[in-house]
């Protein structure tokens, strides 16, 4: 298999990307060459997502598109893994004959075996119990292309929200042992990674299964000891599970970004109850107020679901008022997607798609105004910015501050004729604001 060219298509979330990078590491160690050409690829791997309807459609389209190269191209192995592979294991093999191998979400460490079997003339399927964690010892391949990387600290989820299929596809919550995470982080830091973004289905309760109590604060303290790292960012924090030691560590450790991603989903108590969320509107207000009192400069991001079954005009209006009052720095909105096998999909009073889209647009229009106002308040402030690249044909660079998570938030555009290198940190005085981005110049 030496020098076989492999194309990897990683769909969906950042957690899926981490799995893809681990698989790539194993394959590169065994002589595979990475390519971005469908025509040249001898092995094509699609790491799929099916969290919502649109993600499922994207996965199907990619599989069917790559199947063409399996039929009439260089491709000798077409392999499908990820959440769609776990959920529709039999359908994929039976209905798409071009697919040679299917690996479940907890079986991606068998990718080398799968390729070997297919090259030997067999089709391959592997679905491990959703209990332990896949084990790949090879060095992970960093694919983000910048100076940040994701560190997946746990797999699975125990929440069982009524709209979500993830616990069925990823299994119960399993933390990655701390020593493994530290070793992985050190390796990435040696590859010029300066920002680590901690991800999981939920990061807040990291370690509860291994150490008997939430231990994210202890992990943060260990990661902060890695000299080459500048920023450590936390995504996917459930508000009800944020605990005092975590907040105290964020305050004490300068490398930990004053940034939290809190996926609240809604603010009406009845909707939250039927979603299976373990919090209330007042508890959300109290937690947000607490975080802002402890860290006045904290950036809060959230995600919402609009059009949940039975959501009334009044409940939607309540959500709008809540968002207006809370002034989240960053916000994303999904329209509710009924997922087969979830309690919410069987609920009465499903909302029309047009109504969902209208409500989503209302929320995003409100957030756009909030974001523009918050940006205006930033004018005159000085921020530390990590340069990510140059703006084409202009004396300007694009970067991010601690308030900007990669891939989902805005940018800081830095006007300067001075040459800068990706990964540089510069102090920037903010001189202007767009709806989601800031403009500044290097402080003198």
Regions found by a protein language model. Give the residues of each.
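Conserved, mostly hydrophobic/aromatic
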Residues: 181, 198, 234, 262, ...
């Amino acid at each position: 298999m030496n020098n076989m060219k492999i194309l990897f298509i990683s769909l969906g979330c950042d957690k899926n990307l981490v799995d893809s990078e681990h698989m790539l590491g194993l394959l590169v160690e065994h002589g595979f060459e990475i390519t971005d050409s469908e025509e040249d690829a001898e092995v094509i791997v699609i790491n799929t997502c099916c969290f919502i309807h649109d993600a499922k459609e994207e996965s199907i389209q990619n599989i069917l598109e790559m199947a063409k190269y399996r039929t009439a191209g260089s491709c000798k192995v077409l392999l499908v893994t990820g959440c769609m592979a776990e959920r529709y294991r039999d359908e994929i093999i039976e209905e798409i004959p071009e697919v040679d191998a299917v690996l479940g979400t907890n079986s991606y460490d068998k990718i080398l075996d799968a390729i070997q079997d297919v090259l030997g003339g067999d089709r391959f399927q592997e679905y491990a119990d959703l209990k332990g964690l896949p084990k790949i010892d090879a060095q992970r391949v960093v694919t983000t292309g910048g100076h940040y990387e994701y560190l997946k600290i746990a797999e699975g989820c125990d929440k069982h929200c009524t709209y979500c299929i993830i616990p069925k596809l990823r299994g119960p919550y399993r933390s990655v042992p701390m020593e493994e995470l530290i070793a992985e982080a050190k390796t990435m830091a040696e590859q010029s990674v300066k920002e680590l973004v901690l991800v999981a289905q939920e990061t807040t309760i990291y370690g509860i299964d291994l150490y008997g109590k939430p231990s994210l604060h202890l992990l943060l303290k260990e990661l902060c000891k890695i000299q080459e790292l500048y920023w450590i960012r936390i995504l996917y924090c459930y508000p009800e599970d944020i605990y005092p030691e975590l907040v105290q560590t964020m305050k004490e450790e300068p490398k930990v970004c004053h940034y939290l991603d809190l996926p609240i989903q809604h603010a009406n108590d009845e909707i939250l109850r039927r979603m299976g969320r373990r919090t209330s509107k007042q508890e959300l207000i109290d937690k947000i107020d607490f975080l802002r009192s402890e860290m006045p400069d904290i950036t809060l991001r959230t995600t919402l679901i609009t059009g949940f079954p039975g959501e009334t005009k009044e409940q939607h209006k309540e959500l709008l008022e809540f968002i207006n009052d809370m002034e989240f720095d960053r916000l994303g909105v999904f329209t509710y997607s009924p997922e087969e096998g979830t309690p919410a999909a069987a609920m009465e009073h499903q909302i029309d798609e047009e109504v969902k889209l209208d409500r989503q647009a209302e929320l995003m229009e409100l957030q756009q105004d909030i974001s523009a106002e918050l940006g205006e308040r930033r004018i005159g402030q000085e921020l530390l910015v990590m340069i990510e690249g140059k703006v084409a044909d202009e004396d300007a660079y694009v970067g991010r501050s601690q308030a900007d998570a990669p891939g989902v938030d805005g940018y800081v555009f830095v006007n300067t004729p001075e040459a800068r290198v990706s990964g540089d940190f510069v102090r920037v005085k903010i001189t202007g604001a767009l709806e989601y981005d800031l403009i500044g110049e290097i402080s003198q």
